[in-house]
Amino acid sequence: MRLDKFLAENTGLTRSQANKVLKQSAVTVNGHVEKNGAQKVSQTDEICLEGEHLPWVSAGQYLMLYKPQGYVCSHEDGDYPTIYQFFDYPLAGKLHSAGRLDVDTTGLVLLTDDGKWSHRITSPKHHCEKTYLVTLADPVESHYQQACAEGMLLRGEKTPTKPATLEILDDYNVNLTISEGRYHQVKRMFAALGNKVVGLHRWKIGQIELDDRLAEGEYRSLSAEEIATFNK
């Protein structure tokens, strides 16, 4: 890999900014100042910027995060902290979430630097299922299951929701599996049923389940088997 490309990918600098930094003698490769952006480097080289070691961040990052309440899934937000604060730089700048969660929703978020892979999760044509544990303000009523299975017309929408699966756990808790990602869909579905969501936790995307060994704010790499479920 070219040195200027490495700097751009691992520091957040643009390629032109990386070359300016090189001309300022701010970069060393294996202890020697290097000004040539075209210089080839590999993972065996020790590269430093202004004396600080720059780790290699390999392509092909696939992670699951246990998102806590109170965090947004965007890189920047003026009101709330972002989930990218849980990742070290420069990894945080390379990742994007494959589907977001609202600020007050907890649970599974998949993150990657592979746009094609995440597209298989977020694109409506792939009908990726997501399962949520939903806590309701009022008791569950028996007709909810049929209403979800048949689809319902949400306020402001012209087409009904696609069939969804509702599993009743107890009087106030259900698992809801949907294959769409409409704006605030889960909350709006239960509002249409005359109820209110007071707790929302996503625990499954496709075949990938949130690892119960993770605490809120923790993440781990996906296994090869988990990654492959969205490569089919």
Swiss-Prot record:
Work out whether the entry's keyword set contains RNA-binding.
yes
**GO molecular function annotation:** 16S rRNA pseudouridine(516) synthase activity; RNA binding
* A single BP term in Gene Ontology: enzyme-directed rRNA pseudouridine synthesis
Catalytically driven reaction(s): uridine(516) in 16S rRNA = pseudouridine(516) in 16S rRNA
Q: What EC number(s) are associated with this protein in UniProt? A: 5.4.99.19
- List the active site: D102 (nucleophile)
Family from the record: Belongs to the pseudouridine synthase RsuA family.
Q: What is this protein called?
A: Ribosomal small subunit pseudouridine synthase A
The organism is Pasteurella multocida (strain Pm70)
